């Protein structure tokens, strides 16, 4: 593992996840936080599948029930009503319609190019993303060129560049396994405090099947 990351034990990870889950379950959400409380709204997208615009590329006609552009207005509305918020993507954004195939097989991705989906996600101001199985459909070189255009980090803890090491903490990971971001959040009285928020991602083992 790269020296940039300190290994974390499975027990520590599970303990932290259990604590976070309990805190969420025991803390009812209200529209406005109390003076000694702060709410953080986590927004998540998944399975974008290159659907940037409200357009059905298979039917070759507009479809106002789909597209990241429609989601953008919802994201803006949530940010407007939330004192603190973050935007996360769960993966499967790179493949899934004819526009994705055109970029991969016809236009291609040169160094410095920004994929249309990544360009849209940059505009929306994503904080972090992870990979799905369909990010690998066009090969690793294409995927890395696409990820290079993102203005936000990607994490994946179980993607290695070769054989697994006997010691899991020494696996040669392809991208950073996790991220701990320090954010400044505002409570109900307007007081600001720093908090650390952790993100970790995993890909399914069936990548070569799907």
Regions of interest found by a model, annotated:
Residues 2-210:
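Acidic, metal/ion-coordinating pockets
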């Amino acid at each position: 593992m790269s020296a940039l990351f300190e290994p974390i034990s499975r027990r520590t990870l599970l303990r932290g996840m259990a604590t976070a889950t309990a805190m969420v379950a025991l803390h009812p959400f209200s529209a406005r936080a109390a003076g000694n409380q702060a709410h953080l709204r986590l927004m998540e997208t998944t399975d974008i599948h290159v659907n940037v615009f409200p357009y059905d590329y298979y039917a070759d006609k507009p479809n106002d029930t789909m597209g990241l552009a429609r989601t953008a207005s919802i994201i803006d509305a949530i940010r407007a009503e939330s004192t603190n918020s973050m935007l996360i993507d769960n993966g499967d954004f790179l493949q899934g319609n004819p526009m994705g195939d055109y970029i991969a097989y016809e236009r291609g991705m040169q160094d410095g190019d920004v994929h249309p989906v990544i360009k849209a996600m940059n505009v929306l101001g994503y904080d972090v993303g992870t990979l799905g199985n369909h990010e690998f459909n066009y090969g690793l070189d294409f995927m890395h060129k696409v990820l290079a255009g993102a203005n936000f980090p990607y994490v994946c803890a179980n993607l290695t560049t070769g054989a697994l090491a006997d010691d899991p903490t020494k696996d040669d990971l392809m991208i950073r396994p996790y991220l701990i971001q320090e954010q400044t959040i505002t409570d109900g009285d307007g007081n600001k405090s720093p908090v650390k928020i952790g993100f970790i991602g995993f890909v399914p083992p069936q990548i070569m099947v799907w």
